[in-house]
Amino acid sequence: VEFSSLSKTYSMPGWRVGFAVGNKKLIEALTKIKSYLDYGAFTPVQVAAIAALNGSQKCVDDIRSIYLKRRNVLVEGFSRIGWNMDLPKSTMFVWAPLPKKYLNIGSLEFSKLLLENGKVAVAPGIGFGKNGEGFVRIGLVENENRIRQAIKNIKVLFDNDNDNDDDKNKD
């Protein structure tokens, strides 16, 4: 059985609409279980989902192109400020390793640091399980100009931390 959501593909996050395909008997069992849980999605949401699935798929290509541009702005900008990472293949998220300098504080503290001192919100990798430690997840939900501003804010944070390190080394 495969499950799919319309959340990211059709920009319908939070609408809680998706589908399952697979073995007929398993799908029938799932349908029965689902019928005990609720009475289905709100009708306008179902109509919108039908329109998305049956309509032109150009919007999917358009959305993919937007995320690609945002990803490139983010990853290239991070590279310029010394935060290097592999280029994600195709997603609305960047799963970024912590910069080496911040590995010792972990993803949660690094995320707090970015929020408090850089005014940039990311999701700490530890929130996705123990194997997520050492990473942050960055949603490509802002436009390119906002992403560039976030990079500038993070650069200021990194530069200030480097200045503080230099001061400590002088003592």
Predicted regions: what they are:
Residues V1-D171:
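PLP-dependent class I/II
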